[in-house]
């Protein structure tokens, strides 16, 4: 296993920061529009339990679409593959993450995968519990175990900001309800989903969760199985095929690491058997991925031969 060097990581961060001027923050969500586009930080959590970081890793980042992979893991544990994949498919779309197009073209009208918004809404709908509060608490408890951090919660400001502006996601919910994919109150589902997306943590937390996936679901310190091997495998597969929105193919070729991004600028990556990586860089490219974060991962992948292909 390569020895990750802090001085080298700091240099890579400074190099990648030069690209921030070509990106822009997600200002269509007012609370995310306040982010500093020049911010960039990274944590690498290795299989032997060591952490190397660069940049301000104390800054908290909301998960946004990164939460989709965590909700999927919980729902797969709760309900099993057969039930989950009756409601949502397994295929990449090549469409933007918030597109409704394939829902209208494909029969039956179930979302093509859990990483696009329609599929993620169907997955969140399947989180067990009798109320929004109970379901959110179950998801938070699961995320806290993966991150080894009992303090993790969600940003009320970001959740409220997203709830007030989630017009397209509401449209997706009503479409899914019309076709029998979901059967709950749309506003309750939106309440849960926006709070799920607003769960916030540091790059170190992200990296530790990435390492759990990299270790096939095992806690890096205790060795306890936090999720079944098959669940970790399915999630990593989706990270490769759909994790970077409609740039997933290019990302697989250039970088080759299972990863999931969010429009907050966060990236969670899992290098099987080797390390987890957490990145925060809010300057986004036109696909909604962290522009500086992707540049940083590309440099890491090439320097340390991290591609799984």
Curated annotation (Swiss-Prot):
Positions annotated to bind substrate: 65, 117, 162, 169, 193, 245, 263
Keywords of this entry: Hydrolase
A Pfam family that the UniProt record links to this protein: Glutaminase
EC number: 3.5.1.2
InterPro entries: Beta-lactam/transpept-like, Glutaminase
GO biological process: glutamate biosynthetic process; glutamine catabolic process
Hydrolase recorded as keyword: yes
UniProt keyword Cytoplasm present: no
Reaction equations catalysed: L-glutamine + H2O = L-glutamate + NH4(+)
Gene Ontology MF terms: glutaminase activity
Entries under PANTHER family matching the protein: GLUTAMINASE
HAMAP family in UniProt: Glutaminase (MF_00313)
Family note: Belongs to the glutaminase family.
Subunit description: Homotetramer.
Descriptive protein name: Glutaminase
Species whose genome carries this gene: Geobacillus thermodenitrificans (strain NG80-2)
Gene (UniProt): glsA
